[in-house]
Amino acid sequence: MVSKESCRNEIRAAIRQLSDRCLYSAAKWAGEQLVGIEQDSSNFTPSNTRFQRGSSSIRRRFSTNESISTPQPSVGFSQPPATPLPQEDEVIDGDLYLLAKSYFDCREYRRASHVLRDQMSKKSVFLRCYALYLAGEKRKEEEMVELEGPLGKSDAINRELVSLERELSALKRTGAIDSFGLYLYGVVLKEKGNESLARASLVESVNSYPWNWSAWSELQSLCTSIEILNSLNLNNHWMKEFFLGSAYQELRMHSESLAKYEYLQGIFSFSNYIQAQTAKAQYSLREFDQVEIMFEDLLRNDPYRVEDMDLYSNVLYAKEACAALSYLAHKVFLTDKYRPESCCIVGNYYSLKGQHEKAVMYFRRALKLNKKYLSAWTLMGHEYVEMKNTSAAIDAYRRAVDVNPCDYRAWYGLGQAYEMMGMPFYALHYFRKSIFFLPNDSRLWIAMAKCYQSEQLHMLEEAIKCYKRAVNCGDTEGIALNQLAKLHQKLGRNEEAAFYFEKDLERMDAEGLEGPNMFEALVFLATHLKTNKKFDEAEVYCTRLLDYSGPEKEKAKSLLRGIRMAQTGFPSMDMEHFPL
């Protein structure tokens, strides 16, 4: 693998080149990775280390000893140049380019494009086309506000895409396009729905210039399956490892994703990005305590960070940590209240307090700022479900599916909404879609099983199959075991029912739980064993029932009387005459 100093030099040059082309998101990402590289001890100075203060929970997690050794890569990297190769036309920026860049920075995109209309260098062509693309996006957003229908629906499109595709494809045919132009060409093709050509263009872009994270991100959005990901012909470079870590996470291959980030820790030991990505993977694995610790550590190192904090708010919401969520909402609101993430966090806070109308208002505000903000669409759908407004919930979930067809939460939400409407056939369709994207989640199998149990379907055998899958997927709440026992009991399969009641009882004993499910299991097992003349075993369960008060205790006494009578063959005396 390349050395830390080599990576550092590459990134420094890349930041300048990306910034020169107004690719500010990619430049910001590169800058964060630059300060995430651990400094050599000989170079430790206050200026070098001020972004690397404090311990990192992610670093502690991956460290096996005090000194961090660079892990050996699974594949060999071809040695890249010490810095990105400069284009021949970037040595001296022309006066017109400097003016156009100034207009671009002031968001005057059409002026920037017009200034460069006669400039033919690759750098100028890219900035002109990029400015034109953003001008079209800006106008599209304005039209969406002017013409929007329910929940912001609009048929507005970027009217510059056709001319941009024509020009960029011509440049590609003649070889007069660089890696940045290929990136923009891929974006345009993706917007027009030509995903196959878009992938090819983006692969060509990242292979010729691997430091543009925006190109990698666009490519990742087009990798909707592991088959597509594996088919990409990508050069070996350390940036590819960042891409694979993120792509694996989106494909819910969390172990593989974590392995990539562990590998990258060898050089980028202080990367806040890697820590946030690792927290996302742990969140998907429902390791909420670990995720909370990691986000707390992240905020200590980067206290004004808003990015990814919406995920942190989801963790606090799931843990019902109202005080911590209130603090986080207040903090991000003061930092940048017009960020979609900030609005989403405040929406989560109001949802936790049961103020669903206010929550919807903030999720709507988040969507005003970013129409493609997936979490806001899904969470707004959840709020409408809580408000029993199923039609609005369905609309919100459908918009989430439009943004990301691979998001299981939106499909699951649609299933829940149709189930509430008493339409189990529709609900089943959407639950199946959610399971396709997340087959190892017990909650989804349980939801589908309940559909099969509904009065309209009454397909109990199919429900049993789903509950068995839920058990195999690690149903921590024990819903599946209890339902399997009840279904087998209902179908007259008492041996199978006894098996699952016993398993459920073992689970409740291990977790120290009590309640109606335990009483139900004890009564069934005692009765079943008594019927099968296993009196000693039946007595054990009856004795446990005597620890209850009220009707449970009376039921136990009745069972014990029956057991004694069956054992002796004589009518039993009152229980008070027997020592218990």
Language-model segments: what does each one mean?
Residues 92, 121-123, 178, 212, ...:
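Residue-level recognition of tetratricopeptide repeat
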Residues 104, 133, 190, 249, ...:
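Position-specific recognition of the canonical hydrophobic site in helix A of tetratricopeptide repeat
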Residues 22, 107, 136, 193, ...:
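Residue-level detector of the short coil/turn that links helix A to helix B
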Residues 95, 124, 181, 215, ...:
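TPR alpha-solenoid repeat register
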Residues 173, 206-207, 263-266, 297-300, ...:
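Conserved structural position within tetratricopeptide repeats
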